[in-house]
């Protein structure tokens, strides 16, 4: 009998997703395959739009007739044929932000091992007399324990009883570790006002205005500045008793006074009462300005009940173990088996090995500085993505296609080796890994490279090089080849140490916050400044949680944040954070609407003879509310299918094919540059660069389109939904309104702006920064990308390590100074 040969590659034929040009490509199975290319060249279209889409669709179609019937409405990828594609999983660039009950320990499932350890192997406390009982195998066997002091029997808590999301939750905070309290300083922000002038804010926003009159009846003077009230009067305002008072109510129109009996609500109770009635996020927002969040006073922020904090292993309880960083917890767990009686050691070793096995990959990915009780929502995008990756590796599945979308985001060069090791583990287990990335160190480790291009948008979508790394390096048409083989070079003139502070200083001194120690920082004005350091070294805390709030407070004449001792930044009026969060909450926000182009286009089309004849004004051309929007999808371009037992499936609207407009919109034309007639749906389907030629004569539109082109966004289509943009694209789009203005009073802060950028795109980004600096702006970037760091004027390197081992300025100076600094981990890679 002939043995059929195992396929050795995924065969893609005729792929036309997005801008792909009918491409044919073979992707080796069981290998680490890198996909490179400039932003918008079609990398994600191939990896996610073809390989993942087909792999996941075929897997889902095998589930059941009902599911298959519903899902076949979801379009197949636009491809002639994909052969031998395994079931596929995608690890996306931006994993969702977890909820309030999620911690680093629960996300990584390390808490499961810890809870099991504290249930099975702890010294438990007798609930009758409070004596400690030696560890015993009875717990694992489901038997009771006998107290050596009082002789009574009891059952030890199970692992479930130690979970803060279950039986072990603190009853006061419900296992969240957080309590909301009224912040009295926020109740009267301006004490120079009188109560009649609205000094007590909650009475004006959360309560009837009548409370001012009631306060007067309580003996408080309401016509003198608040800062002149006696201590007794202030106490009545903040904490006075709820007593009824008789007042005379005069309506605003002054007609007819009405006597009323009214109960006095002091300022603090007004907020507490409003908080108790909150039903949704909108309501919470109204109250939140008067609240401060602090650790729960009963559990101290540990989330655990008193009973769940009783069992001890190696002299500490579960809350203390969870407060350790992962690195410290590993050392502690290693010592657990030896601390127990001999008969307990085999079981303890098994539990500890499961913890250490899961922890090893997290350490390889550079996450050893995170504490297990760190709230999941406070992790950065890169940290969440690496947690997701480590979890996948631990599952040890085989025969799966893993598509990783830029896993090197937020990764310090020192952790790239760990990332490659994790991907190699997946391949070693018999899987295929396709990684879309720009980091040349990641791409250089691939078994096979596919490069898309040559440029972005309509000019891309072709395979310009494919083969081993050596073959791609020798390829004439490759655009990544020079970066795979070349030595790095500086693209901007270096500012000398003597000139660095010629345009002034921004100075700040801080106290301890998180892992950042008290420090003083000096930043040169009008320069490109990079803040660097390994993950967890304190970059984000220093810049986003300290510098920006301090600059904003000083500019507004408000009180500095508690942990900032002083700041000296005379002349700085604006501190702008340009981060990578998606623009717009839903698909109704597009590049054209965000960049203020769509309104101008609507007006232009409303001026045409065809529009006038049909009676269409500018409002009719709105795809959100206008008469010409598609009635099937309501102008969103897509519809959602409800699939029972599965998440809803989004498909392109079958009526408008994603254009968002009804057929009638295609009957209104405007003349383009070459005399061709264009409709608004056709324009919205064009890239920025194509639209420049098509909108000659529309001055405002031209200006805005040229700005987008200069920002390196010429390949984006005007109708592209902004939430779908990559982090780097979103950052640059947010800059569109800032370009060209004088900026010497502004500080721009970018959080990892090179996310999603090819080395060639990084050069475009540097020219954007140059444009801002030339206008006098101070540009501060939190960054791991070595090309950008090399081209900065000034570098502040945090560290030396992450977590407790970081939080200091290791060195500051030019990139050459950092490279020469022996204590700097970043410097070694420069």
Predicted regions and their residues:
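Conserved phosphate-binding elements of NTP-dependent enzyme cores
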Residues: 1-830
